[in-house]
Amino acid sequence: MQISRFTVDLPGAFSLKGGGILENLTDSLTRSGTIGLDMVTRNLNFLTGLTGVTPDGSLVIPDSMSLKMKMEMNGPQYKAKLDLKEGKGSMNVNAALNSSTEVYTADLKINDLQLHHFLPKDSIYELSLSADAKGRGLDVMSFHSLANLNLSLDQLHYARYHLSNVHLTGNLKGALATAQLTSDNELLKMTADAEYNLAHSYPDGKVTVDVTQLDLYELGLMPKPMKRPLAFNLS
């Protein structure tokens, strides 16, 4: 089945182009297909009212935002790609899943995305980060499931605070979830390690936190800078 190229143009709101092809949809081994969509936004703020959010300007959908999506299917293998551009910022997402083996991968890249354009009444601004995940098995309680997660926060501007060099890694193996968080910036220098056994019916985990520098003055919690940085260890 071929999906003819189509165009949807709602003046003042958005324009959408797309098309694709689908074959053997009822056969789980030989089915295949590709669908692509290109969208450019104009004024979509009427959608915020449909979601139940009060249309007070606290949440908006920016004008002239470009969104491209592509979805592919080949037997049990599924792939999806999303590219978003808003002003000088961008977001790219890639994901893949094999429904037979339950093997999956995903990666996310956000570069200079201006969150203030989406939340104009909040004090949140530029965001840059990258993340990737891969694993096997969709049941996190299963001893056979495996997963790895990596996340790096390169830049987050919130109010007068600038966060950077924050890294999170996570692993799942044998129903044991482990995570490590590190932060190395002027506001906070720390490491944290945690683990939790998902197979037990009772809470079974531990956390260790080592803070070598916490700037309470920059956080607005102290009237003047401290002579020595605050440091502590918790476990």
Task: Show where each model-derived region lies.
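Interface amphipathic segments
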Residues: 1-235
